[in-house]
């Protein structure tokens, strides 16, 4: 498929599609377009960059009017409330109470504002529904619940904010300046084998939608080789397919381990593209039309039931009609109920194929940019933080393993945001969607060539920005940015004179190594102490008449104690959450190796199922999905890469506190190897304490 063209700050957006798009993925038009049996048009979604979304919401209110935003609500059943109150459902008095309050079932518990919902009307909305001011100045909310808009035919548009769109736009902007070319996403080779090879290896840290543990475990099994494979990949790891037990059948069929079968010949043409396994909401509609004789309007009612947050009850109401229709078409009741059960799984958030296709486009674009323009991509995703699955430290460690040169924070070169440095000495600074070259540097003129293949290699490094340092607030940012507009700092004293910061902020800068380059005459292990000493002197305050400042001579100066390598790593992690001087695990690797503890890379290379192993690393991710039947999943990171850990429910109950709170773990267990996917099934857990800053790591915990 042909990707759409994107220019910087394009009003069309990254996921804009042309007129051929529905034909490419066989979209079900009834899902959005009105027909005789529909009482509503249905919500329309429009993606926007995260930073641009507020502009678009304001623009929509300015153009369309303040009276076109909508509200949403949460529901709660009466029985659920009784159980929360500790009441016995078998008590006659409680049952009588439940009967009395049954009419309150699913009424709103409280109201909340829909994140990005806008309503379009032909006439002033206030003449149709009641309005009220929102808590945010300048915003107005419709008092109706969003699902109440359908009966009166009001159109709701959702503005969706995606941080990854900001990353893509900024990355394209950086490339245009660092490589002197313009990347046109509409001209990308969507069959680039090198990009698919990367995804098949699950080398996808920082790639949109396919960077999670579950996606990384699926990619080597699915082995995507074309765009539609990515559409399937995006939709596969969702609650609907998982709870409907469709993931493993699809993967087994794709690998040739299970024959491709269909519930009934009448639905073969619907399920052929997903190997006989229903994955998309649109397929549920198409199956109802083909097998049960539903009209497009009836199929849309089914879709609405599948996608509704209270869809189980609505699905039960339509169940008998669906099964009866299939039986009228000669499908046995047992087969009909099996088909219905598969469709019913989508009541738990089956993914629309149209959404999956739009997401898959961003998946491929981000994988392509990361593969061919890793420095620019890293800079863009770091400047877009917080977002995504991994911390800046993990993103940087992964980029370094892929050959990206990352330079430390340096107040003679760094600004607030992360920047790019070229081998010829030029520095590209980025801020809020704009770029500028460093002071007294000549800016190259882009030749605007449309790029279909990567250009000749040019060395580009990422310079970390001051924003990474913990303890600096928005005031520090404003003051630092204003001062750096007039040139870099030349010394600690020069910086203190030009910028107004409190003493704590200056200490943070010194302890993070931001002044190290100003003390090049000192050994590397003493530079931070020298900087801290000078910062304390420069920020001491005005000279007092009875206590004049006396600068000691070189002979009088006492030698400052040196940082050990472990202390440097600890200081880095404490101040920034990462260290370019070395991963904490590297400091204890010789000791661990003597005790048979493997690196993440060694565990992957062994690849022998059932082999006992021991691994250790920083816990960068903890997950306990509701669809995993109590299993807990960890991701450990060491100096060579990452390894995934699987913990059974009983093991987790035994060691829950240790697993949930310890930043550095040594785990013994057995390897699980299936279709090139390597996990460790954990049996024993032990906390490690290095004093190397591991306690300052912020992981992705149970989200």
What kind of feature is each model-predicted range?
Residues 1-703:
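Noncatalytic, beta-rich nucleic-acid-contacting surfaces in large DNA/RNA-processing enzymes
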């Amino acid at each position: 498929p042909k990707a759409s063209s994107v220019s910087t700050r394009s009003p069309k957006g990254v996921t804009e599609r042309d007129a051929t798009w529905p034909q490419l993925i066989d979209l079900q038009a009834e899902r959005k377009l009105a027909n005789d049996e529909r009482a509503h048009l249905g919500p329309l979604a429009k993606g926007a960059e995260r930073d641009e979304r507020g502009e678009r919401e304001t623009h929509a209110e300015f153009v369309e009017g303040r009276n076109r935003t909508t509200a949403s609500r949460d529901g709660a059943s009466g029985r659920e409330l009784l159980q929360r109150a500790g009441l016995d459902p078998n008590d006659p008095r409680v049952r009588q109470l439940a009967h009395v309050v049954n009419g309150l079932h699913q009424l709103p518990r409280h109201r909340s504002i829909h994140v990005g919902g806008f309503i379009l009307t032909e006439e002033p909305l206030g003449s149709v529904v009641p309005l009220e001011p929102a808590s945010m100045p300048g915003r107005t909310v419709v008092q109706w619940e969003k699902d109440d808009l359908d009966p009166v035919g009001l159109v709701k548009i959702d503005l969706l904010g995606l941080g990854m769109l900001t990353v893509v736009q900024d990355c394209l902007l950086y490339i245009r300046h660092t490589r002197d070319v313009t990347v046109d996403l509409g001209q990308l080779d969507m069959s680039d084998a090198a990009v698919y090879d990367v995804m098949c290896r699950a080398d996808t840290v920082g790639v949109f939608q396919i960077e999670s543990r579950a996606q990384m475990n699926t990619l080597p099994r699915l082995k995507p080789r074309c765009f539609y494979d990515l559409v399937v990949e995006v939709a596969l790891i969702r609650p609907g397919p998982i709870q409907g037990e469709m993931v493993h059948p699809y993967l087994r069929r794709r690998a040739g381990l299970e024959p491709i079968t269909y519930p009934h010949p009448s639905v073969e043409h619907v399920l052929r593209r997903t190997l006989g396994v229903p994955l998309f909401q649109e397929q549920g509609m198409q199956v109802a039309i083909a097998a049960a004789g539903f009209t497009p309007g009836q199929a849309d009612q089914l879709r609405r039931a599948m996608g509704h947050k209270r869809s189980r009850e609505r699905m039960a109401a339509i169940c008998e009609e669906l099964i009866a229709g299939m039986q009228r078409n000669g499908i046995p009741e047992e087969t009909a109920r099996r088909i219905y059960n598969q469709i019913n799984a989508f009541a738990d958030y089956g993914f629309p194929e149209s959404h999956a296709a739009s997401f898959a486009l961003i998946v491929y674009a981000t994988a392509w940019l990361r593969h061919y323009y890793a420095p620019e991509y890293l800079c863009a995703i770091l400047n877009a933080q917080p977002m995504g699955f991994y911390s800046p430290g993990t993103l940087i460690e992964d980029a370094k393993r892929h050959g990206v040169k990352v330079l430390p924070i340096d107040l003679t070169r760094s600004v607030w945001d992360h920047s790019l440095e070229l081998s010829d000495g030029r520095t590209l600074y980025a801020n809020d969607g704009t770029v500028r070259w460093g002071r007294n540097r000549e800016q190259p003129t882009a030749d605007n060539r449309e790029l279909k293949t990567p250009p000749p290699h040019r060395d580009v490094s990422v310079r970390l920005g001051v924003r990474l340092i913990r303890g600096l607030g928005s005031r520090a940012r404003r003051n630092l940015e204003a001062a750096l507009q007039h040139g870099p700092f030349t010394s600690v004293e020069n910086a203190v004179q030009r910028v107004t910061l409190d003493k704590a902020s200056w200490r943070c800068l010194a302890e993070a190594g931001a002044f190290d380059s100003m003390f090049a005459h000192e050994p590397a292990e003493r530079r931070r102490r020298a900087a801290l000493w000078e910062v304390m002197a420069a920020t001491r305050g005005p000279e007092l008449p009875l206590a004049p400042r006396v600068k000691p001579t070189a002979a009088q100066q006492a030698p400052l104690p040196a940082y050990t390598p472990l202390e440097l790593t600890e200081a880095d992690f404490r101040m920034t959450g990462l260290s370019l001087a070395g991963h904490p695990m590297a400091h204890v690797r010789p000791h661990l190796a003597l005790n048979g503890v493997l690196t993440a890379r060694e565990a992957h290379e062994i690849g022998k199922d059932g082999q006992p192993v021991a691994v250790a690393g920083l816990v960068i991710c903890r997950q306990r999905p509701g669809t995993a039947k109590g299993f807990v999943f960890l991701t450990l990171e060491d100096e060579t890469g990452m390894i995934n850990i699987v913990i059974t429910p009983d093991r987790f109950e035994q060691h829950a506190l240790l697993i949930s709170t310890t930043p550095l773990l040594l785990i013994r267990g057995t390897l699980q190897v299936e279709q090139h996917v390597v996990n460790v099934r954990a049996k024993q857990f032990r906390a490690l304490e290095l004093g190397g800053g591991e306690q300052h790591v912020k992981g992705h915990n149970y989200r």
